[in-house]
Design a protein with these regions (language model features):
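Short, polar N-cap/turn motifs at the start of nucleic acid-interacting alpha helices
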Residues: 58-62, 141, 163-183
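Conserved tyrosine-mediated DNA breakage-rejoining catalytic core shared by Y-recombinases
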Residues: 52-89
Length: 203
């Protein structure tokens, strides 16, 4: 049962599209909320890790880093890890810096990547509330949470053929078993697997 509960948590593509489509990008925090969701979907960071990132964590010089080093001080289980950035994650960083600069927030090395209205770090609970309100606005299941975007990231890695050990390292799991609970096989993938057997073997 535990595997079932974990496996069912990741959102489908259509759910993410509806969620992102429900954001008012002209509202005070709309664009940041949009970028936050996309960033998690492409890095798999926990919300507590995301909200404690500084500009220096993700930027070298004037460009996004190739990867982010997550210190043991902010990770679950106090184990440091490195998470690579793909092109979409890098673009999120650029847009976040632009967002912060235009709204008068510092973009200095020690400044929060996700600042709050007090110019401090965005509280994790506030980020969760933002997603909850958005989810309710567009009529999606309560399973859509910041953590579910991490599950979405894990499933995309699995579907791309990433091996379980590498996935566990990127996600910061102590055990591959934990990573496997984050992933499940979609109906489409199961159909494709069975269809590959057609024309082979007995008929």
């Amino acid at each position: 049962m535990r595997n079932k509960l974990h496996a069912d948590k990741h959102p489908e593509d259509w759910e993410l599209k509806r969620l992102l489509g429900g954001i008012n990008l002209r509202s005070t925090w709309g664009k940041r909320t949009y970028l936050m969701i996309v960033f998690i979907c492409h890095t798999g960071l926990r919300i507590g890790e995301l909200t404690r990132l500084t500009v220096a964590d993700v930027v070298w010089g004037e460009e996004p880093r190739e990867e982010v080093f997550l210190s043991h001080r902010i990770t679950k289980g106090q184990k440091s890890r490195v998470v690579p950035f793909n092109d979409i994650a890098k673009q999120c960083v650029r847009k976040l810096l632009e967002f912060n600069r235009k709204r008068g927030f510092s973009i200095g090395p020690e400044a929060p990547l996700f600042p709050w209205k007090t110019h401090g770090f965005l509280p994790s609970r506030e980020a969760e509330r933002e997603i909850q309100k958005l989810r309710e606005k567009v009529g999606l299941s309560p399973k859509i949470t910041p953590h579910s975007f991490r599950h979405y990231f894990a499933n995309r890695m699995k579907n791309a053929g990433v091996d379980p050990f590498t996935m566990a390292v990127i996600l910061g799991h102590a055990s591959v078993d934990t990573t496997q609970m984050y992933t499940n096989t979609s109906s489409a993938n199961k159909r494709a697997a069975v269809n590959r057997l057609a024309g082979k073997g007995v008929a």
